[in-house]
Amino acid sequence: MKDKIVTFGEIMLRLSPENNARFTQCNAFEAVYGGGEANTAVSLANFDVDANYVTKLPKHINSLRQYGVGVDHIVRGGDQIGIYFLEKKTSQRPTNVIYNRAGSAFALATADDFNWDEIFDGATWFHFSGITPAISDTLAKVCLTACKKAK
């Protein structure tokens, strides 16, 4: 039997100027969906691990499903996902990142959104990063509840 690993975190939309341009120099952005916990789930799924991703999203599941990540416990709701703008470093300037995650579906998630008993059924490992409980007071409570349920 394969290990079942549950990851929990926010998937975000990264927008970066093309060709190492600065924000003020671009008319188009490269768009990539990702997030630490989602990336972990994708990597685990690539190694044939039963990887399951838990989050709250408006309507953005397909980018995970294509990698074989379990998305059965993604809660639907909210109006937006978190977005961040990444200006890539060059030899003459550092990386510049601007986050816009306030009011995202995940930032507004509450403990009542997730059925942790069902989510953790058969799970052998639970993974989330330190940023997740720091996003909002309610997410700190969600993480604490999840850890207690994970035992």
Place the predicted regions along the sequence by residue.
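Short active-site-adjacent helix-start/loop capping segments
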Residues: 15, 59-60, 81-84, 93-95, ...
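Ribokinase/PfkB-type carbohydrate-kinase core domain
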Residues: 1-6, 65, 71, 90-151
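Glycine-rich phosphate/adenosyl-contacting loop at the front of the ribokinase-like
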Residues: 1-67, 72-74, 109-112
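Acidic, glycine-rich active-site loops and adjacent beta-strand->loop/helix elements
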Residues: 56-60, 78-79, 89, 103
